[in-house]
């Protein structure tokens, strides 16, 4: 089933920008729930780029960056998952002591609120990679760029996994 939703079409336009699409999915907090979720992605040939899992007593929220967010959201909805899509910032920082604090100070000093973040791996030496959820993507991208920290768009991210 193809989703013919104007909102999704606009959200998933293939424009080049400096954000990536993160899919957040509610999972029941029980043994095997994450395995079932990832099995669905595997069967659909969806490749995970980043994953974060936060839990509460009754449910968990899994946040994923995937190679094909449009197809993934369709598949998950068809499988009955409650999910949402958020634009987040992926960044490349130097893999050395102090690089993370430099980035965090740049954001904090410029009054950019970091709501959450998580790391991911890519095939590039001497670099570390993070996903950032901030209150104002545009402002954060400007601050990061001015401080020599490179935001990564979806296309850049895909090239790192080839």
Residue ranges of predicted features:
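Targeting/processing segments of secretory and organellar proteins
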Residues: 1-2
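A conserved regulatory-domain signal marking ACT and ACT-like small-molecule sensing domains
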Residues: 11-162
């Amino acid at each position: 089933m193809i989703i013919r939703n104007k909102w999704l079409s606009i959200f998933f336009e293939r424009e080049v920008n400096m954000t990536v699409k993160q899919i957040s999915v509610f999972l029941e907090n029980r043994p095997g729930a994450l395995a079932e979720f990832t099995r669905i992605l595997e069967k659909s040939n969806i490749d995970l780029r980043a994953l974060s899992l936060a839990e509460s007593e009754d449910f968990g929220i899994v946040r994923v960056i995937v190679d094909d967010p449009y197809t993934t959201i369709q598949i998950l909805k068809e499988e009955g998952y409650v999910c949402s899509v958020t634009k987040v910032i992926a960044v490349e920082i130097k893999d050395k002591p102090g690089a993370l604090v430099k980035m965090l100070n740049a954001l904090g000093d410029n009054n950019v609120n970091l709501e959450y973040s998580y790391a991911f791996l890519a095939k590039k030496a001497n670099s570390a990679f993070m996903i950032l959820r901030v209150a104002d993507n545009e402002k954060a991208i400007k601050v990061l760029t001015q401080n020599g920290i490179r935001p990564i768009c979806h296309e850049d991210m895909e090239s790192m996994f080839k």
